[in-house]
Amino acid sequence: MTVLAPPRPRSLLDFQDWLPERLSALLDNADTMHQVLERPVRKVPALQGLTVCTAFFENSTRTRISFELAARRMSADVISFAAGASSLSKGESLRDTVEVLSAYKVDAFVVRHPASGAAHLIARYSGKPVINAGDGRRAHPTQALLDAYTIRQEYGSLAGKKVAIIGDIRHSRVARSNAELLPKLGAEVVLAGPATLLPADLAALPGVTVTTDPKEAVHGAHAVMALRLQQERMNAGYLASLQEYVERYQVNEALLREAESGAIVLHPGPLNRDLEISSEVADGPQSRILKQVENGQAVRMSVLYHLLVGRD
């Protein structure tokens, strides 16, 4: 009996339907895209004739610019949709907005939205490939992919590597996406933060451990990721005080000494310097924070190519 392979995912909303082999292929292809970005002329015609709409219903600097550059590097046309200047402010529904944009013959959507699950709705309404650029607390898959790519770039593989993620896990779509992705690629993930900022459901994911002890999390880690305290998403009562948080959970030189020698430091940005991460570590020799930003473009080029052009 012939066993058919699962179909290629049409969208990148999260990692639920993505097999490890496809994820590895995305990262392999990012190497090719990285080579394109090293050329004197950093452009290829791979998406010529296609239109990508970046629909951001929430503020973004790195992700929006990275996606728009990625699409243009591959010769796609880009429609940049800003929710604040749209008919949404006049009461138009999300569904109607998406259907109007689809009528302009858009080939794919890149979506950021403050509501968890919004990217899934837009995929349903548009009938087009959708890349989730962050929806509420739920998922930010391309950030996790570029984090994985940065770690792989350093070590050659994620297999057997320990990744510690420290901070506001509860409100972080980045933490959730990394917790889903990295074990699929062979890494061990340890999430650490105050008990009030640790959602219990993540402990049930394969390859993921949850602790309130940052030293335990960082011990023997090959990569240490600091997360921003998302105070804009918090109500009162999550933290006793910021000072107490800094003393216990800040990723600084003292905490980093618990990690593997030469462990790399990551942060998805934006940084709150000297809150979740010390300036000495953020700017130090083990930091790969700017490398993450650089790698984001190659990874997002790979994702766009995979969804719009790639063939099995």
Swiss-Prot record:
GO terms for molecular function: amino acid binding; aspartate carbamoyltransferase activity. One of its GO terms (cellular component) is cytosol. One of its GO terms (biological process) is 'de novo' pyrimidine nucleobase biosynthetic process. Pathway: Pyrimidine metabolism; UMP biosynthesis via de novo pathway; (S)-dihydroorotate from bicarbonate: step 2/3. Its EC number is 2.1.3.2. The lineage of its organism: Bacteria, Thermotogati, Deinococcota, Deinococci, Deinococcales. Belongs to the aspartate/ornithine carbamoyltransferase superfamily. ATCase family. It catalyses: carbamoyl phosphate + L-aspartate = N-carbamoyl-L-aspartate + phosphate + H(+). This is Aspartate carbamoyltransferase catalytic subunit. Catalyzes the condensation of carbamoyl phosphate and aspartate to form carbamoyl aspartate and inorganic phosphate, the committed step in the de novo pyrimidine nucleotide biosynthesis pathway. InterPro entries: Asp/Orn_carbamoyltranf_P-bd (IPR006132), Asp/Orn_carbamoylTrfase (IPR006130), Asp/Orn_carbamoylTrfase_sf (IPR036901), Asp_carbamoyltransf (IPR002082), Asp_carbamoyltransf_Asp/Orn-bd (IPR006131). Pfam families: OTCace (PF00185), OTCace_N (PF02729). The keyword Acyltransferase does not apply. HAMAP family: Asp_carb_tr (MF_00001). Heterododecamer (2C3:3R2) of six catalytic PyrB chains organized as two trimers (C3), and six regulatory PyrI chains organized as three dimers (R2). Keywords: Pyrimidine biosynthesis, Transferase. L-aspartate binds at residues 90, 173, 228. It is an enzyme of class 2 (transferase). Carbamoyl phosphate binds at residues 62-63, 112, 140, 143, 269-270.
